[in-house]
Amino acid sequence: MEEDDSYVPSDLTAEERQELENIRRRKQELLADIQRLKDEIAEVANEIENLGSTEERKNMQRNKQVAMGRKKFNMDPKKGIQFLIENDLLKNTCEDIAQFLYKGEGLNKTAIGDYLGERDEFNIQVLHAFVELHEFTDLNLVQALRQFLWSFRLPGEAQKIDRMMEAFAQRYCQCNNGVFQSTDTCYVLSFAIIMLNTSLHNPNVKDKPTVERFIAMNRGINDGGDLPEELLRNLYESIKNEPFKIPEDDGNDLTHTFFNPDREGWLLKLGGGRVKTWKRRWFILTDNCLYYFEYTTDKEPRGIIPLENLSIREVEDSKKPNCFELYIPDNKDQVIKACKTEADGRVVEGNHTVYRISAPTPEEKEEWIKCIKAAISRDPFYEMLAARKKKVSSTKRH
């Protein structure tokens, strides 16, 4: 039963009545205070709840935008970076962008390589900041290259590779003072190691270099002097025992090679066996090589024809129109260095002294000849490396 606050017993003195009234008033004040505190607590709890969900929403929105930025970067690196900067997810500084690329979370390593290889002044600054994030102190050159080449995928263009490997050589020499006479020596040896890796571990390369040949190839590159034989032997053994782990992103290495070909299309190829038959093949011209496939959807080519040291000419053929040939100038009987995959999956050397090919139309024949001629005459990567090698070999130590 609720107490009636208005009831006053009749036997109380005036003083007791006053005391009772004071107690009752204080009680009402306390009840009002308690209610006010309850209301305040409820309000604060509500605010905390709203604040939590607002923060959560903000984080979710931010994560969504970062994911979108990564996707954009993987499709178009410059647009992706621009999007992240515009949405305050990345600072517009070479250091911040380099850190983002170095962490590489969710990023396609081919896209990282393309961005770092650009020749814009800002991209070059990002490249140097990116290389600075790598710690190469006390690593031998193969160990440093393993770390570096895993952080992105080297692009195909010679000038881009040159800039990136130059930055690597500078950083390696900075971390390991005194190992090489100059950054040029480090640069040339780095390429020698990358090419050694290909020669030793590519099944299409039949002639595997020995350690003696590797040492001989690198004579005189240390500003005119030789590098210690033990160093070269160690580097050779390291690569022989464990090939470089190259980022693949989307399928195998070759898939990437065929993304931006110089030219592609259906052609007829005359077989090199005893019975000469014409076979329809899908040809792709890229990276100074002519690849041919049975179907456009095949990931692995049926054959590879390196264009180095070859020439091209138009020819007449009694059976097929619009023909041209690949051949070795001044040596008509020499077999062209090439390889093909047999039906059982074995990779064998080709046996052609010439490759005769027929195009569907005269226009396509002209276009193929023009593109192949351009590929044969242009090999800036090897020209660039040869020039650097000549420079370090001819330098005399003072």
From Swiss-Prot:
Please classify the protein's predominant subcellular localization into one broad category: membrane
Q: Sorted alphabetically, which Gene3D superfamilies does this protein's record hold?
A: 1.10.220.20, Arf Nucleotide-binding Site Opener,domain 2, Pleckstrin-homology domain (PH domain)/Phosphotyrosine-binding domain (PTB)
The N-acetylmethionine modification is found at 1
Protein species of origin:
Homo sapiens
Locate the coiled-coil region(s) and give their ranges.
10-67
Domains (record comment): Binds via its PH domain to the inositol head group of phosphatidylinositol 3,4,5-trisphosphate.
Q: Name one GO cellular component term.
A: cytoplasm
- Which part of the chain is the PH domain? 260-377
Q: Which gene produces this protein?
A: CYTH1
**Protein name, please?**
Cytohesin-1
Q: Which GO terms describe its biological process?
A: establishment of epithelial cell polarity; regulation of ARF protein signal transduction; regulation of cell adhesion; vesicle-mediated transport
Q: Where is the SEC7 domain?
A: 73-202
